[in-house]
Each structure stands twice: as C-alpha cells, then as structure tokens.
Amino acid sequence: MRIIEGNLVGTGLKIGIVVSRFNEFITGKLLSGAIDGLTRHGVSDSDITVAWVPGAFEIPLVAKKMAESKQFDAVITLGAVIRGATSHFDYVCSEAAKGVSHAALASGVPVIFGVLTTDTIEQAIERAGTKAGNKGWEAAVSAIEMANVLRTLA
C-alpha cells in the first residue's frame, strides 16, 4: 500500500497570500500568523508574496490569478467576514468560499481558505490569535502540507 502525505517542510516553497483590507484589525493578525507559520516551517521571507485586496469578495479573483501564474506552490487567502444585520454576510461568505475553491480546482495549485466567517467580532478576535489560536497560522501549515502532497503526486 502506498500512502501519500505532505510533510511540513517549507524550504524552497513559494507562497502567495491574498489578504483583505476590510476588517484589517483582524486580517492583519491573520497575516502575521500566516507569515510566522510559514517562516517557522522553513519558507524564506523572500519566497512570500502578499497581495492586499479591498474585501473578501475580491479575494478569489486575485487568488486565481496568483495560482494560474505558476509562480507559487500554494496560495493562502485571508479575510474576516463578520455577520451584520443583513443577508450581505451570507452572499459574501458563499461567493468567497466558492471562488477560492474554483481557483484551486481550475489552476491545480492549492488555494487555502483562511477567511474567517464569524457571527461576532469577539469570535473573529479569538480566531486571530487569542483563545482559538491563529487561523492564519493554520492556513500556512495547510498550504505547506498541500504543496508537498502535490509535489509527491507530480
């Protein structure tokens, strides 16, 4: 039996990160967590490219362009969508998730969904480096693992 698993060694990997400026007090912490996770696993600062976009709805297009460029072994998407009083939250979350998934499937490059979708600001803060860890860091580790899984399959 052959088992395929990705390791968590990031040396030599080139990583793109798309991060939304909306709710930057949260997304900035996710970005810091992602960069920390990447560099602790061997990814060089010079191999990380960060693209800022206005909001979560804009993330998929830039993620797809980065993935299709074949300059990156993986792309991480970071955002924070916090529920408000209207249905806008549902549309943005749904389209962001679908778009990120499409970017990965269309390009063949791992595109990691690190967009927080929370009911409250407190939940977002918890997931950006306090009680619930840092989801940016977790997305970075997922990106490394998936890039290495795909290298094994190549």
UniProtKB/Swiss-Prot annotation:
Residues that, per the record, bind 5-amino-6-(D-ribitylamino)uracil: F22, A56, F57, E58, A80, V81, I82, F113
Reactions catalysed: (2S)-2-hydroxy-3-oxobutyl phosphate + 5-amino-6-(D-ribitylamino)uracil = 6,7-dimethyl-8-(1-D-ribityl)lumazine + phosphate + 2 H2O + H(+)
Pfam family, one: DMRL_synthase
Entry annotation: catalytic residues: H88 (proton donor)
GO molecular function terms listed in the Swiss-Prot or TrEMBL record: 6,7-dimethyl-8-ribityllumazine synthase activity
Source organism of the structure: Geobacillus kaustophilus (strain HTA426)
Pathway assigned to this chain's UniProt record: Cofactor biosynthesis; riboflavin biosynthesis; riboflavin from 2-hydroxy-3-oxobutyl phosphate and 5-amino-6-(D-ribitylamino)uracil: step 1/2
Keyword Transferase: yes
Name the UniProt record assigns to this protein: 6,7-dimethyl-8-ribityllumazine synthase
